[in-house]
Amino acid sequence: MAMEEDLARKGLPNLPFHASPLMYGKEPYRDLEMETRKKMLASFESFCRRAPFRCKSFAYKRSEVEEPELFTARFKRDLVVFLTDNLEYFQNFDRVKIYYDNGQRMVTAALHSALDFVLSKDAVLYRMASAREYRLSRVADCICTLKLTDIKFQRSELTETDAKVFGTNYPAFRKNHLKHIQKKEML
């Protein structure tokens, strides 16, 4: 079932998924109750479980990469290692499309540098990403939110909003939210 059909069947609005505004009740979710927003999150997570994708996420402590140059260098290194370890997988495709919204210059620089270093420049296609236009951009947002929430659980740093959305039971969070994404994670 398509996500739009699932939302309609549940009487939920069909709005482009964006985790932070959804969780905090900002536009375009401002007029929706928390329970409605949680149902929308559940519908989107259900879509993510069924969607055919593989992913890899990276997380860094600010204190370990305070300087922008240090972050860019470390992220590039980690991307190069990941891409090299998975080169056979990526070489199965004629084109590797990179959708990114250029939101953070350091991330953009590391992505371009690592991908251009490991993969053939003719094989990499860069595209601007928009949550309104590309559902995979929304999937990435959901994955990042779940992975960040996992880190917050591990460090006992849940916010009040995190607790309202995901609860405070870490095993339940892992079972109900995180494990479905982890199955799609590339090593």
What residue spans do the PLM features occupy?
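Phosphate-ester processing/binding pockets and catalytic centers
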Residues: 1-187
